[in-house]
Amino acid sequence: MVERILNSEDISLLISGRQSNPHKLLGIISENSSQDRIILFRPGAHSVAVELQGNIEHATHHHSGIFSLTTPKGTLLNDYRIYHQNGLLAHDPYAFSPLWGEIDSFLFHQGTHYKIYERMGAIPCDVRGISGVLFVVWAPHAQRVSVIGDFNFWNGLVNPLRKVSDSGVWELFIPGLDEGTLYKWEIVSASGEILIKTDPYGKGFDVPPLATSRVINSDRYVWHDAEWMEKRSCTQDQPLSIYEVHVGSWQWQDGRPIGYRGLAERLAQYCKEMSYTHIELLPITEHPLNESWGYQVTGYYAPTWRYGSPEDFQFFVDHLHSEGIGVILDWVPGHFPTDTFALAHFDGEALYESVDHKEPLHPHWHTYTFDYRCNEVVNFLLGSALFWLDKMHIDGLRVDAVTSMLYLDYGRKEGEWSPNIHGGKENLDAIEFLKHFNFIVHKEFPGVMTFAEESTDFPKVTEPINSGGLGFDYKWNLGWMHDTFRYLKVDPIFRAYHHNDLTFSIWYAFKENYLLPLSHDEVVHGKGSLLQKVPGDTWSKFAHMRLLLSYQICQPGKKLVFMGGEFAQGREWSPDRSLDWHLLDNPYHATLHKCVAKMNSLYRDLPYFWQGDGKQESFRWIDFKDTENNVISYYRLSGNDSNQALLCIHHFSSGYIPSYVLHCQGIKMCQLLFNSDDIGFGGSGKGNRPPILCIDHGFSWGIDIELPPLATLIFLVRFSN
């Protein structure tokens, strides 16, 4: 009977699971001038009941799961509902017109659909007054795409999607489904292979390792941070002291990590007590492997379910904002893992991954790199960034592994990479992507910060795009970090021969807008904790810690410290356990903790540390040549106050100097603000003697101070007119 109105080849494709346009066979089909016919496909069902205008009818079973029911001419989608095999009574998914429009296709295939997260994936919505979920996915090489879940007993033949774009977008609106529905994609590749995949645009996933997508309404949460969102602004001339956090190992309770909601209050209170302005989260985008720390992402639009739901994460951000703490997210657009359930060979072909290299896997991480030539891939990544800023109210994005994106030969040997069109090693497509990313982030979300983890001297990373730069707000100064650690590892007796490691970074400190990181990367993989990096006995180690952290505070650039560094975590960090908070019962750790809180509050309150700190005018050497005593000294200046400055002195040797004369002209007042050797901070109590002004014939030419071992002194000085 249905063969009279349907093409037999189309029926065969539907039954065999290779039909790309099921809507032309299913739903309401005009049979003749006097009647319509509802055609249903229920493979494996023996009967199908239909509620037609309030009456229960049973459809006729033809063969191979095809059912039909004759209806009056002009039957509409609201006139009937179907009893599904799971008991759900809902409207017919195949009676709806396409919801993915031409403008969607145009923008997506141009790579500029900046609200793509509201159009791709699983979107709870109402269509013509009927609630359900719109499923949309990009799979251009697929013969067939179906959505599978409990609602169809994970049978890929039941709910095939319609191909609505020549470039491979598929969609299906399923009425009656709601938030929390679990689903995956079943994809038939061009070769006929059946693939089961999670949703690239999924907003939630089951707790790993289950890797099942979950329908999420990202707009359900009611935010309370309007005041914060309105006033947040560019931090170039504001204090920026970042506490880097791995959510799963900051604090545990009852043998497991504290979830988003429980963590919110504790972490906000802690950051306030320690005077941190922001936290930076190691990636909480969904990831299957805990040991990857979140850097091998399979869910670019979803906070990991390990610590709670997306709504719990929204509460977490909201609460930190209410306490005046910003939230920065590590974001990984450079590479993705090879897990077969996710992005890798998504529709049976290389789709998201680049095929430019002879060896497709990146040699450092054995992951795929993204194809930045493909507009749809670019749109996927841009959409992820904008999703976190829009729906999750994130205040900044730190882009991981930028260097690996910028250079085609990064980690590759000769012959393993191909030069760009100019014969160079720069990845021109990745460079354009990063510019596009920074442009649209700053355009759509003024005040949001972007950070580049970039380890080479690639030019103009923080220059504006219209000046030829990449457009980042800040670049991690990894050179400063490595030089500092290399210097501090040397025994103080021999540091005179390594003085250049201490001073070199200042000569390029104003080339970019820098952030000075003491990050997680330096306390893993056998590198030891910060405490383990510095030499000496216990007292000397903690003196070194006070010196290191105060030196970081005083140097030009924004600040970042990985959790545990602020109280000298003793052992190397692991993502599989809590920090050793019990160490705060030890006076050494407790007094360092107190010292860091004091330093952070000074940094936050004194504009000399941060106002214009990306400009040469904010810094002036006093003496960088005292290799005999391992001392450097300099002024930190604020553009608004030329009559005063901070005088910072760092003593990197273990000897005590009761009288140290510093040649600094024109000082008429010198007040000690901070001494890292204070007894209250665990020090020896040296360095608190009031400074003596050195004056000849009424001319102030220097100061005489007491210089404690392994210590930082910070003075507020006032100059003569």
Curated annotation (Swiss-Prot):
It catalyses: Transfers a segment of a (1->4)-alpha-D-glucan chain to a primary hydroxy group in a similar glucan chain. Disulfide bonds: none annotated. Transmembrane segments: none annotated. The keyword Transferase applies. SMART domains: Aamy. The active site is at residues 400, 453. Coiled coil: none annotated. InterPro entries: A-amylase/branching_C, Branching_enzy, GlgB, GlgB_N, GlgB_N_E_set_prok, Glyco_hydro_13_cat_dom, Glyco_hydro_13_N, Glyco_hydro_b. CDD domains: AmyAc_Glg_BE, E_set_GBE_prok_N. GO terms for molecular function: 1,4-alpha-glucan branching enzyme activity; cation binding; hydrolase activity, hydrolyzing O-glycosyl compounds. Keywords: Carbohydrate metabolism, Glycogen biosynthesis, Glycogen metabolism, Glycosyltransferase, Transferase. Pfam families: Alpha-amylase, Alpha-amylase_C, CBM_48, GlgB_N. It is an enzyme of class 2 (transferase). GO terms for cellular component: cytosol. The keyword Oxidoreductase does not apply. Pathway: Glycan biosynthesis; glycogen biosynthesis. GO terms for biological process: glycogen biosynthetic process. Its EC number is 2.4.1.18. Monomer. HAMAP family: GlgB (MF_00685). Belongs to the glycosyl hydrolase 13 family. GlgB subfamily. NCBIfam families: branching_enzym, PRK05402.1, PRK12313.1. Catalyzes the formation of the alpha-1,6-glucosidic linkages in glycogen by scission of a 1,4-alpha-linked oligosaccharide from growing alpha-1,4-glucan chains and the subsequent attachment of the oligosaccharide to the alpha-1,6 position. This is 1,4-alpha-glucan branching enzyme GlgB. The lineage of its organism: Bacteria, Pseudomonadati, Chlamydiota, Chlamydiia, Chlamydiales.
